[in-house]
Amino acid sequence: AADTYPTEDGRVVPANRFEKYLDALLLSSTNQGGTYDDQKRHYLINVHGAGNDLDASYDSGGEMFIRTYWAGYRGNFVQFSWNGDQGSPFFANNVENAFQTSPALLVFLRDNLHVLRGATVADIDLLSHSLGNQVALDAIRLHQVALPGTSLLHNITCIEAAIWGETF
C-alpha cells in the first residue's frame, strides 16, 4: 500500500515503498506510480547508515523526512536503502556492502534523477549517515572516474561519518 504525504498547497502525493530499486525505477519511468512530486524540482536523498534492515531504513527515512520538513524543506525526499544490517561484530561485511551499493546510488542519481527526471546538479542534495557516507562518497568517486571534472550533485552533508581517514 502506498503511503501519502500532504503538500502545502493541499495536494496529496504518493510515497510508495519499493522492495527493489528496479521496481522504483520502472514505475517512476513509466508513470505508473512513483515517489516524486513532479511539481517540485529539488531532490534530497537520504542514505542511512549501518545497522538498518529495510524496515529500519523506512523508519529512519521517515524520521529524517519529518525533521527536514519541519526545518522548512518542501522538495522531494528520497530514502536510498542498502544492505547495512549484517550485524556486529561483522562490520567488515557492511563495509563491503557499502562499496557494492555505491554503483547503484550512482545509477539512481545519474539515470533516474538527471536523465529521466531532468534534474540538474543544483537540484540534488544528499544526506548520509554513518557508513552510508561510504556509499555516497564512493558513488561520487565513481562519477569522477567516469566523467572527470563534472558534478553529480550540489551538496552532501555527512552525518557521523563511519569511514576511515585514509579514504581521502
Model-derived regions, located:
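Active-site nucleophile loop of the alpha/beta-hydrolase fold
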Residues: 157-165
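The conserved beta1-alpha1 loop
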Residues: 45-49, 129, 160
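Extracytoplasmic/secreted cell-surface and envelope-processing proteins
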Residues: 54-56, 87-90, 134-137, 165-168
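Flexible, membrane-associating and regulatory peripheral segments of lipid-active enzymes
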Residues: 1-78, 82-89, 93-96, 100, ...
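Short glycine-enriched nucleophile-adjacent loop
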Residues: 133-146
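Gly/Ala-rich beta-loop-alpha elbow adjacent to hydrolase catalytic centers
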Residues: 105, 128-132, 136
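Alpha/beta-hydrolase fold nucleophile elbow
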Residues: 117-130
